[in-house]
Amino acid sequence: MRTLKETSVSFKNIVTLSAVLALLVTAGFARERREVPPLVGSEVGPQMDEIVPKRFIVDPPTIENLGFRWVIEGDSNRNASVAVAFRKKGQRRWKDALPMLRVHHEVSNQAYGPYRTGNLFAGSVLFLEPATAYEVRLTLRDPDGGAPVKPKIIEATTRAIPKAFDGGRTIEATAEKGLMAAFEQARPGDIIQLHPGLYKGPFEFNKSGTAERPIVFRGPTDGEAVLEADGVGGRSRIVTLNGTHHLFFERLTFRNAHTAVYAAKPGGSDGLVIRRCKIHDVVYGINTGCENSRNWFIADNDIIGINPTWYPRPSKTYMSPGHTGVNVYGQGHVICYNRITRFSDSAAIYNFGPPVDDVLKHCVNIDFYNNDLSWAQDDTFEADYGCHNVRFYRNRCYNAHTGMSTQPFYGGPVYLIRNEVYGITSLSYKLNNYPAGILAYNNTTCCAGSGFRPPPIWQNGHFRNNLIMGGSGHALISGSPTPYSTMDYNAYRRNDPDRLIQWTDHRGNRSQYRTLDTFFKATGLEEHGMLADYDVFMKAGPPEQGKTCQPNDYDLRIHKEAKVVDAGVDLAQVTEGFSGKAPDLGCYELGQKPPHYGPR
């Protein structure tokens, strides 16, 4: 949530800066300086170029994706790689997936809580079919030796879309008798059918369903079953879960509470489903900050907060009155096809801080896709405090201070793929607090200010095929302290004839570049980058700062004469099915129908 204001300086100025700090100490101001917590996280192992494969982890699968981690020792020169291929079990032909990301002890959140990431590879196989068994082939190579002779082949199955048990009882619930009276009768596999009416909370459910036989709370098809608490003040919650699992909430209305559904520590909740519900007049919609929460399915909901406006963003109280629409932590969650609006953050990873020591309890393998996210006083999407294989793809974001945030991220990858982002006032990409492991592919982002303006502290980031459009200032003003960060095949808008790029390299040297060619020759970045303008779109202009827009006010599909057609690079699974000589830039391939956003 916090924004770290960064000032990029050359290392040549460190002596001067040190002298100023010494004067402050002499003047007695040192006691006012914030203490940085000690470095925590992974230990640095043996320093050697040869690789030693260690633990291989298959993370809890989601409905469309599989995620993996391969811990290693060595490879200190970072020249090892893991190629990935997959196929449905029983088929013969392998298909390529994206290679695994090399994670190598990057230190995230350096100013507020330094955390050293591990020595590993991490990555996902994307856009798969639900409830389907796959074989995944991982080929580890290292010129310095130590890699297995044969590829590792593992089997993994995507999760099924959750459904009620067919053979359970139906228990009728009425507002007069109360919801708890029906719940006390329920056993795994039952459906509690709520009749229209007002059900006054709070509710704490103390028994669970099972994965095969969940307990389902289902609202009526005619009329509303409304669950409410005591208002947005205090800490009123409608539903609280703590070690209670496999409960489904469907076709219900939640309202008038601080939090609609909360999974508390230490137990959290496994297998929670919230589907086709309406949630409104709340500070938080759905919330868990527990590492033991797993395998949620949050789909097709309308979630509306209490923020009266999204602009201007308050400088000190920007996380109130409405906080976050969907806020999750743990493993295996799916948040899809929701409409979330009028919160400070629309959809987010919970601000957990550094992960616990148990790597199986890290925040991994979480999906956000096909959501409609708007009116965000802070971020439409926030991956802050995630660890590996968090995926944000095919979402529509608009009317927000910030588009996509990763401040910090603990290792990566965090995938940002084919998102439409428009009407941003500050940062399309918020990469503050030294995040590590950002993969941004085929996004279209349109900001009123500079197109790409995160502080020069993001690490191990890789950007391809993006349309990065701004309205004023530099097209690109940023930098990275890791020399292995890469940017190529992206298009930028020149907003100012005298300013194009300001870049701070891994040595701390800041330079200005007036052309992409001089930028490439100096840095090796954007060899195939290009300039573009809003005329590549069917209908769009630079967003005006603070002006509220609606999706029908603009159309970010590209037209067939646009210079960004066929200007991209082929990325396994991401650009599959492109129609021309090469993939197009941005979130929409020419001629392909845009995805559906929000409830179906």
Language model features with spans:
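Solvent-exposed loop/turn segments flanking beta-strands in beta-repeat/beta-sandwich domains
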Residues: 73-86
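Recognizes extended acidic, P/S/T-rich segments that occur
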Residues: 83-131, 143
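Extracellular fibronectin type III
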Residues: 141-164
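Acidic Gly/Asp/Thr-rich repetitive segments characteristic of extracellular carbohydrate-active
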Residues: 163-205, 519, 584-587
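Right-handed parallel beta-helix/beta-spiral solenoid domain characteristic of secreted/periplasmic
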Residues: 163-177, 196, 208-260, 531-534
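Acidic, glycine- and Ser/Thr-rich low-complexity intrinsically disordered tracts
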Residues: 169, 190, 314-325, 459-600
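Right-handed parallel beta-helix
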Residues: 214, 220-223, 245-256, 270-281, ...
